[in-house]
């Protein structure tokens, strides 16, 4: 089967979490998985992330390239892609359902979509963690009728549409995924049934209240692209 998908994963010091994601990719029932290029854009990891990624070479067509902030790493990987579709995943997620990739790609083809995403759930999270991700999923659903909203945890793009939008804004210091997804036409966006699992480390480092406030401000500034180019303190506090 000719490759139609490239997967791009920005990473920095993800030796603990990245293997979960890569193992879940190995378990996907998508028939083109063997031909799918998996690109890890590493931002100078010092914990063995690169070595762990390359240890999957006998199971995945995986390679490591230089990265940076997520937007830089994602664009770097996308520039190497020649396939029709590019899937961006965060390094700390995993795909618990082996059918997710197959179903997402089927939806992209059938509806001629530019972007597809899915729901988010917290792995072993607290009530508040689950509530915040449920709120994210709700806003994502509402956005599907108004202005598309997707996070970098799972963004499946038509590659040409991705570059027509300019790719991820590398000057953006906050919510670069939202800044990009809101440019997608509503009729070319869908939420695929299912979910990815992620951690609660964002909430642990910034606090639930701070994350809610930042999310609220993002929604309030959805028409102001300049807001996303100003330092909101996210990476300075959230970076591990």
Question: What positions do the PLM features span?
Answer:
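Short, acidic, metal-binding catalytic loop of nucleotide-sugar glycosyltransferases
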Residues: 24-34
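Short beta-strand/loop segment that forms part of the nucleotide-sugar
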Residues: 34-44, 65-67
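A conserved acidic beta->alpha catalytic loop
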Residues: 42-50, 93-94
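Glycine-rich, basic loop-to-helix element that forms the pyrophosphate-binding segment
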Residues: 65-81
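Short aromatic/hydrophobic "clamp" motif used to bind/position activated sugar donors
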Residues: 86
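Conserved donor NDP-sugar-binding/catalytic core segment of glycosyltransferases
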Residues: 98-128
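A recurrent flexible, glycine/aromatic-enriched loop bordering the glycosyltransferase active site
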Residues: 115, 120-127, 138-157
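Acidic donor-binding loop at a coil-to-helix junction in glycosyltransferase catalytic cores
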Residues: 173-180
């Amino acid at each position: 089967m000719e490759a139609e998908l490239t997967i791009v994963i920005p990473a920095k010091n993800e030796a603990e979490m990245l293997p979960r994601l890569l193992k879940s990719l190995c378990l996907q029932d998508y028939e083109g998985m063997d031909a799918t290029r998996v690109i890890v854009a590493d931002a100078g990891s010092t914990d063995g992330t690169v070595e762990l990624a390359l240890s999957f070479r006998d199971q995945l067509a995986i390679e490591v390239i230089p990265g940076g902030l997520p937007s830089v790493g994602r664009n770097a990987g996308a520039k190497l892609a020649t396939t029709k579709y590019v899937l961006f995943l965060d390094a700390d997620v995993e795909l618990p359902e082996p059918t997710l990739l197959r179903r997402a790609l089927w939806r992209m083809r059938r509806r001629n979509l530019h972007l597809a995403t899915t729901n988010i759930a917290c792995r072993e999270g607290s009530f508040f963690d689950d509530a915040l991700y449920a709120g994210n999923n709700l806003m994502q659903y509402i956005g599907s009728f108004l202005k598309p909203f997707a996070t970098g945890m799972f963004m499946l793009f038509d590659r040409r549409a991705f570059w027509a939008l300019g790719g991820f804004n590398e000057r953006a210091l906050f919510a670069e995924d939202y800044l990009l997804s809101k440019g997608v036409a509503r009729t070319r966006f869908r939420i695929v049934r299912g979910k990815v699992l992620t951690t609660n480390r964002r909430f642990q480092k910034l606090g639930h209240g701070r994350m809610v406030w930042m999310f609220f401000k993002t929604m309030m500034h959805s028409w102001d692209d300049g807001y996303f180019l100003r330092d909101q303190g996210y990476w300075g506090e959230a970076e591990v």
